[in-house]
A protein has these predicted regions:
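Mature catalytic domains of secreted/periplasmic carbohydrate-active enzymes
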Residues: 1-189
Length: 189
């Protein structure tokens, strides 16, 4: 399986995952990262804000399962990246997994994790709101995974555009609700 889906493939308990979280970001340096991005001529920096395992890489109010509360680092790396990107004129973009395996049964074998209304209203919308209101202009929201309904896909794209009209949304918000099309994993289009 995919290493980024190991929590589901190997049924790793969340408590075991948290043991590893303590040492996250020990050598994190937002200034050096953004300088490298800038000096290499890249126009934007895309960072994973939350992957399928549900661990948030920012100071979210929706769960204590985040880098600020669970790591020795204790700071918000998204805030630091936002500050450094702005200093250098680099655009910031977020990858955001629609699914959250702390809130639903993992289905790693296919993209069929249904999104229930509770997840939409208590996790997805509040987390998107935090990401799009606490870190300045966001160039792109890269959604991934999940099996939302067409109506849910439209709502997620709408939430993004209501908060930041210029933010691009990729096609992995599903159901033709994105602003541009992307290919599949491990494929060339």
């Amino acid at each position: 399986g995919y290493p980024e889906q190991i929590k589901a493939w190997e049924n790793i308990p969340t408590d075991d995952y948290l043991l590893k979280a303590k040492d996250l970001a020990a050598n994190f340096d937002a200034s050096a990262i953004c300088k490298t991005v800038h000096d290499s001529g890249m126009k934007y920096l895309m960072i994973t804000s939350k992957h399928h395992d549900g661990f948030a890489m920012w100071d979210t109010k929706t769960t204590d399962y985040n880098i600020v509360k669970q790591s020795n680092y204790g700071k918000d790396p998204m805030k630091e990246l936002s500050t450094e990107c702005n200093k250098l004129g680099v655009k910031l973009a977020f990858y955001f997994s629609i699914i959250d395996w702390t809130k639903q049964t993992p289905e790693p074998y296919g993209n069929v994790n249904p999104i229930d209304e509770d997840l939409m209203t208590t996790v997805i919308k509040p987390q998107l709101t935090e990401l799009l209101t606490n870190y300045g202009p966001i160039a792109e929201l890269w959604f991934d995974m999940g099996g939302p309904t067409a109506e849910q896909s439209q709502r997620m794209a709408q939430w993004v555009h209501e908060l930041q009209p210029e933010t691009m949304v990729n096609s992995r918000v599903w159901n033709k609700a994105g602003d541009f099309e992307v290919g599949g994993d491990n494929s060339v289009t």
